[in-house]
Amino acid sequence: MKARHLSLVLLVAVGCAAVCAGAEEHADGIVARILENAAKIKAADPKAVPMAFWDFDGTIIKGDITGGWDDDWNILYKGLVHRTIEAGLNSVYSGEEGLKQFFDVDYPRLRRGIGKWLAWPFLAQMYFGQSESELDAFCRAECEKVYRKWFYASSVKMLHALEKAGVENYIISASPELFVRSACDSLGLPAARFRGIRVHVACGRITTQIVYPVPDGEGKVENLRDIVLARPHGVAVAAFGNSYSTDGAFLRYVAKQPSLPGGAIGTAVMINGRHPAEGYAEHFVKVSQDETVGGMRTQTTARPPSAAGHHDP
C-alpha cells in the first residue's frame, strides 16, 4: 500500500508540473498539495471521488460576471445584468432608462437599504417569464466573447490540472446560476457542475421562485454538502475563494473536515483575500494573483461598479 501511494504521489506531481507550466508561482505547489491528499484518499478508498469546490467572482474571473468591472474611470467590462438589459432579455428593465433605474436607483436601494438577502435573489428573479434556453445561449456567447479573457490564468491552470488528474471541479457562486453557468464551455466543465442562485423553471420559462439555500456564506456550506452527498463516494478535498464574508464558511468547512480517508487533509485557498475574519486566517493557504487568460490588465486598483457589483469584500 505504501509503495502504491508513493507511485500515485509521484505521478500526480509530474503531471502537475507539466499542466501548470506558465501559471503564477503558487499554482504548482497548490495543485501538488491537493493531488497528494487526493492520492491518499484513493489509496485508502479506490472508489472515492475527490472533489474541488470553487467560488466564481473574484476567484475564477477577475471582477464580477453579474455586476461588471471598472477602474473608477472606465468600464473594463459590462456584467451580464447590464448586457441582458441591453439585449432586451430582462423582464423588469429595458433600454437606457431601465439601465439607469436599475443601477442608480433600485439595486442600490435594495442592497443598502434592505440587504443582500433580498437584493441578490432579485438578480435571478428579474428574468421571470424569459426563455431559459434563450437566456442561457446568450450568456454563454457573452462569456466566450468577453468574460473568459478575464479568467485568472492561475485559477484556470489549477482547475484544469485537478480535473485532468481525476479531481472533479464544482463551482458554487452567489451570482445567478444562469450567469455563472455560462462559463461551462469556457472552462470545459459540465453545466451540472455549476451552482448559483437558482430559480424554478416551468415549461422552459424562468419563474420568481427561489431554490434555497442561497449559496452565500453558510448557504455555500449547505450547497457543498448537498453536492457531495449526491455524488456517490464523493469527498471534498479542496476549496477556493476570495472573500472571507461570502466564502470563508465553506473554505473552513473543507479545511477542517475530520477523518478523511487515508489521513488526507482538505486544502482551502484564499485568493487575493483582504483582512481575514476572526477564526479564519489559520485555516487557509493565502495567495495573490493578477494574470488573466487574455492578458487583461487594469491601470488602477479595479473594483466592481459600486451599484452593480453585488459581492462584499
Where do the protein language model's features map onto the residues?
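A metal-dependent, Asp-based hydrolase signature
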Residues: 65-66, 72-157
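Bacterial N-terminal signal peptides that target proteins for export
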Residues: 1-8
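Short amphipathic alpha-helices and their capping/turn segments at secondary-structure boundaries
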Residues: 39-42, 123, 183
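Low-complexity, intrinsically disordered/propeptide-like segments
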Residues: 9-14, 254
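Solvent-exposed coil/turn segments that connect beta secondary-structure elements
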Residues: 57-59, 65-66, 199, 273-275
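C-terminal cap/substrate-recognition subdomain and adjoining C-terminal extension
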Residues: 25-33, 44, 49-51, 133-170, ...
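Short, flexible coil/linker elements and helix-boundary hinge sites characteristic
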Residues: 1, 20-23, 39-46, 80-84, ...
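Non-catalytic pre-domain segments flanking phosphatase-related domains
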Residues: 13, 18-56, 62-64, 68, ...
